Amino acid sequence: MTRVKICGLMDEYELECALKAGADALGFVVEIERSRHRLSLDEARNLIGMVPPFTTSVAVVEPAGVDDAVRLADYLQSDALQIHGDLSPEEIEEIKRRVPQRIIVAVPPGSDRAVEVSRIADAVLVDTPVSGGLGGSGRTHDWSVTARMRSTLHAPLILAGGLRPENVMDAINVVKPYAVDVSSGVETNGRKDPVKAEEFVRRVRSCQ
């Protein structure tokens, strides 16, 4: 079964929207300045604390280094840490050794470091590159490239980038990911839309 993560949740209303839609995981963007979904540490920690049992809370972070990642993990207390940026495999391995959270590492399609990172991380998230990093563009990428990546990885692949109810079934059929990750694709006027969120999850489930 393909899992669903709804990311970029900003407040309790959006959290409830994602839960009612049936998302398996909820994502919170923490202190990433380029993201319009960014939360402060305290805002993120408060929302993470509201995530019920059997739903995975994911803190999306861009740490400056190992110590910064550990600081964020310790404070936020999420179930998983989604790491963006250019940390080396050695740094990711050190983070994994020092924190209890599952580690998801974000990479662009066709990344040279994806295979090495996948030997360490609990999952690899493939997202569309944007100026200054990954994610938040609302744009898809070449799914055939990501499908080829999947067969080389040693960890589950999470597909992100421009997904929405209208294209998620095609994306799953091409890539066959462990999970899909959506944010702006289930929004209307910059806010999570319960109808779109429910339709997105319904279409993912129909692929099973």
Swiss-Prot record:
- Family designation: Belongs to the TrpF family.
Keywords annotated in UniProt: Amino-acid biosynthesis, Aromatic amino acid biosynthesis, Isomerase, Tryptophan biosynthesis
> What's a GO biological-process term for it?
L-tryptophan biosynthetic process
Keyword Amino-acid biosynthesis in the entry? The reply is yes
Listed EC numbers: 5.3.1.24
At the highest ranks, the source species' classification is: Archaea, Methanobacteriati, Methanobacteriota, Stenosarchaea group, Methanomicrobia
**Ranges in a coiled coil:** none
InterPro entries per UniProt: Aldolase_TIM, PRAI_dom, RibuloseP-bd_barrel, TrpF_fam
Cysteine pairings via disulfide bonds: none
Annotated pathway: Amino-acid biosynthesis; L-tryptophan biosynthesis; L-tryptophan from chorismate: step 3/5
Spell out the protein name for this chain: N-(5'-phosphoribosyl)anthranilate isomerase
**Matching PANTHER family:** N-(5'-PHOSPHORIBOSYL)ANTHRANILATE ISOMERASE
Gene Ontology molecular-function annotations: phosphoribosylanthranilate isomerase activity
Q: Which Pfam families match?
A: PRAI
> Which gene name belongs to this protein?
trpF
Q: Which EC class, in a word?
A: isomerase
Query: What catalytic reaction does the record list?
Result: N-(5-phospho-beta-D-ribosyl)anthranilate = 1-(2-carboxyphenylamino)-1-deoxy-D-ribulose 5-phosphate
